């Protein structure tokens, strides 16, 4: 039996469920539990059950992705879960949006940055995460990543649309320089909110982006025995949850 570190309830997992996107219990999978595990550990220097934490509205946080547990975070903290296209809105490339959120204790961004457009520059998104934090504030961050070479699938994406031709989705792009491009074999993911994947990060590229944004204490957290107790398992060492401080 495992204890859900979000709800505090007990649950079982089958062997085949013990992976990043598996292990669903009470609406939360292994990735969600891992994010919450690290959030409480970073805040309290100890692992806490999110539902049982005392309310503290002096702690200010922001979510870019985590509607699955945003209700609990909003209950416990001065916390807002943002969206890209509607209020409360945060376009991480938009300086006006970024200025609305500042002096944050923490930001949660889980599996978002692989969908961000390459224009104007993905580095700007990492820089803006840093800007929104207070000194010593931190991020709990994840994206799919591998070991090897970073891949930008559409590096010159600028003015594009997706069309269907002969039952195949094609991306038709006009670059900033006016050149015409067509791509097939598009990669979509995102669960209920299907989006086009723009890139595949690597561990080294993530370290570079975070370091260039001036983050420190960058850590990639491979599930250990303490995490296993809460039903947190990975099936490989790719796409781990990351924490980093300002």
Feature locations, PLM:
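S-adenosyl-L-methionine-dependent methyltransferase catalytic module, highlighting the catalytic core
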Residues: 120-134, 138-245
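Conserved SAM-binding loop
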Residues: 54-158, 203-204, 241-246
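Conserved N-terminal segment of class I S-adenosyl-L-methionine
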Residues: 1-102, 110, 227, 233-240
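A generic short-segment signal for beta-strand/edge and adjacent turn/coil regions
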Residues: 48-52, 108-111, 188, 208-213
